Amino acid sequence: MRIMASPFAVLLQNVSFRYTADARFILHEVDLAIPKGAYLSVVGENGSGKSTLVKLVLKLLKPSTGTIAHFVQRVGSVPQTKMHTLYFPLTVYEMLNSYRRLLRISHKWVVDAVLEEVGMRGAKKKLVYTLSGGELQKVYIARSLIGDPDLLVLDELSTGIDSRGQKDIYALLKGLNTSRNVTVISVEHNLDAAITNSTQIFHLSEGHGHLCNPQQYVSEFLDMQKKDALACAQCRSR
């Protein structure tokens, strides 16, 4: 498929979404232009529409209104839920090699290459269900790299991982963003990581989105939240 030339990886225009015609809208008239090579963190409260936005970008859902245009050829993803892998006695290598065959990639060496890239080549003979949360995330990132993606989409990457593991994961992801020039879209609940690693932050609140850079996010949203928290505390003390 021929991809039109564009400075953007993904372009959302006036995108709204609801599951049925009589249901409430989860996303409301979202406009979002994601430049190629960007590292975009999607943040917001639970239920604000973050995972829905990711599913729309991955074409797992269709927008109720508006359009989503992709200007990249290959998309990799790391899902939030990975439990299905834990029920099968596969080694790390077997799991990734199965995915390589699914993508019809002929070169077997790519499995070792992506494991090396994420620092997990020494674990290729380990059973997947024996891995720690951080190790499993690295394996799934390696899996997403097998198809040499132009766009990498991740949903709550740091969930269930200790602070040291999170630090390793974010360093890896930032390195991939730089070395491969891969565009990253990451649903994020770790605000410190979003502010530190992102080139852009997309803040969702009740289905409405606002795009800003990390510095703007700190001044416009975090400071506002601190002021609200202080006001609430003062009310309770009266």
Curated annotation (Swiss-Prot):
The keyword ATP-binding applies. One of its GO terms (molecular function) is ATP binding. Pfam families: ABC_tran. SUPFAM superfamilies: P-loop containing nucleoside triphosphate hydrolases. Gene3D superfamilies: P-loop containing nucleotide triphosphate hydrolases. It comes from the Bacteria. Residues 10-231 form the ABC transporter domain. It is a peripheral membrane protein. GO terms for cellular component: plasma membrane. The keyword Ribonucleoprotein does not apply. Belongs to the ABC transporter superfamily. This is Probable metal transport system ATP-binding protein TP_0035. It comes from Treponema pallidum (strain Nichols).
